Amino acid sequence: MTGSGPWGAFEPRFYFTKYPDGLEGDPARGWGFRTEIGTAVVPTFESFKKFMPKENWWPRDEMWNKHYFGQNAFNAAPDRYDASITKGFGKPEGIEDYCRKAQLVNIESNKAMYEGWLDRMWEDASGIMTWMGQSAYPSMVWQTYDYYYDLTGAFWGAKSACEPVHILWNPVTDGVKIANTTARDMEGLTAEVKVYNMDGKSVEAYTQSAIVNSPSNSTVQCFTIGFNKERKNLSLNKPTFASSTTYG
């Protein structure tokens, strides 16, 4: 048992890193079985407009706090959630755009939350319980389906990660693994990775595939993506020019 929390959405790498302490937990215990963990989860726009008065739609104001997106639910880290939307998917241009991009953060964070434990299955990690499945009040935090029973991105992220045989990428180690939570051994599975650049073109140098056997109730390594980690300085060996004069 490793305590409760955290309850705010983090970037995927967080869930694969040596695990931070939860409330009443011991950081030395690592992943273990986390009895309560969750993220802020903004609902879809269709649900949002049912409970939020139109004059309070945008930008975020004190009325949002009454639906737990502010100081009333500070441990859901709403400011970090908003920053994640802007960093990952661009600054929202209005409430509809905000709710749409929020679903992508919901998917990403909740998928990674489960995958972080699957990545270390039985190597200190035994499971998690999500706080929480559904909100009993129109809310913007801690739900996989909302007050109106509409599915959020958190549901789809968790569903993807929890498929019985699941392939995952560890963004910290760049390892690709197969998690098999069934009672049946799987043989001759094909694991393949393709990496695409910002133009949508495949970067063939990173394409890999492997035939993998996946024992029941375990996670196995397929391969590691060979990203270049040695050169962090993108300007290294590039010609530069400088001047100390007013006119350059």
How does the language model describe each region?
Residues G3-P6, E36, Y68, M186, ...:
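Intrinsically disordered, low-complexity segments enriched in small/polar residues
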Residues M1-F33, V193, N197-D199:
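Polar, glycine-rich mid-to-C-terminal structural blocks
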Residues A161-E163, E204, L234:
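Residues that act as N-cap/strand-start positions at coil-to-secondary-structure junctions
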Residues L189-R231:
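Intrinsically disordered, low-complexity Pro/Gly/Ser/Thr-rich segments with frequent PxxP/GP/PP motifs
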